[in-house]
C-alpha cells in the first residue's frame, strides 16, 4: 500500500514538474513575441502603488484618495454648462507642465481662451493644441499623441463636440442613430491599452443631456454612449453652487462661485467623496482659499474670532487677508500644504522617511560588523 502511494506521489510530482516546465516555456515564448512585461505574475509587478499626478487642487487630490489623477487611466469630467469643467481640466494641464511633462489639448468645441489658460498657470507656448474638423480626426490625433509615449496628459474638450464625419457631411435633419456612441466605443477599445502602456492621463470633458420621459430617478445623462462610463477609472461631477461676492467697493459684484466636485466613480480609491473649491473668475481655483479652509479644519491654522494664525503668528484678519498673506509667502504656503498632505496620507512625512532611512542604515552597519567579526574569528594567523 505504501509502495503504491509512493508511486502515485512520484507520478503527481512528475506531472506537476512537466506542467510547470510547459508554463515556463509558454511565458518565455509570450515575452519573446510580445515583449517583456506582456505577462507576469501579479506579485512580481514592480509598481504596486498607483502612480498619480496632482490635479492642481488640494481639495480634489484629497477627494480622489490617491493624491491626484492616476497615470495610465481615463478620466471623465462632466457637469452643467459653465460649472467649471474646463477650469478643472486646465489646472491639470498646468500641473503636468509644472512637473516637467508635456500636455496636449484637443479643442473640439473651438472655444479655448488662451489668456484664461495662461491666468490659470498654463504655459501656452508649450501647450500642444489641436482643433479638429471631425470627431474621428480628434480621436485619431489623440491616439497618435498617446502612442508616441512622449505626452503626459491629453485633454479632449468635449465628447459632445466630437461630431462624426458622416454627420458633418450630411444635411441638418438627417438621422444618425448611435453614430457617435459607436465612434466612442471603438475609440475606447483602441486607446485604453495604449493609455495604460504609456502611462498617459486622458481627460475627457463631457456635457449633460436630459433623458425624455423619465418620471423617477435622475433624468441626466452624458452623450457619447456608455463606453466612456465603463472605461473611465475616475468620473467627476462638477456643479457650481452659490456665487461669491467681492469685498469693499466690489461687495455687490460676483467675483467667483463655490463649486462642488463629486467623485462619482473611482477605481483606485473609495468613491463618492466631495471636494468644495472656490473658482474665482479670471483666476481659477483659489488654492490659498482651499488650503486655509482645510488647514483650519485640521487645526494646523488656528482661528480665533476673525484672526488666522500659524505657529502662534497672526497671518491675517479675515480670510481675504489670510489668503493674501499665503500668496505673498509661498514658503509658508508650501509648508502648510505639505503638512495637510501628510495628515491625509497623500505623501510620506520627511522626518519619518529620514528616521526609517537612518534605522535601515544602522541595521546594515550592524550586519556588516557581525560578518566582519565572524570572518575575523574564522581566520587563523600563522607565524
Swiss-Prot record:
Domain of life, per lineage: Bacteria
Protein location: Cytoplasm
CDD domains: RecA
Keywords of this entry: ATP-binding, Cytoplasm, DNA damage, DNA recombination, DNA repair, DNA-binding, Nucleotide-binding, SOS response
Example GO molecular function: ATP-dependent DNA damage sensor activity
InterPro entries linked to this entry: AAA+_ATPase, DNA_recomb/repair_RecA, DNA_recomb/repair_RecA_CS, P-loop_NTPase, RecA-like_C, RecA-like_N, RecA_ATP-bd, RecA_C_sf
Protein purpose: Can catalyze the hydrolysis of ATP in the presence of single-stranded DNA, the ATP-dependent uptake of single-stranded DNA by duplex DNA, and the ATP-dependent hybridization of homologous single-stranded DNAs. It interacts with LexA causing its activation and leading to its autocatalytic cleavage.
HAMAP family assigned: RecA
Name the UniProt record assigns to this protein: Protein RecA
Top-level taxonomy: Bacteria, Bacillati, Bacillota, Bacilli, Lactobacillales
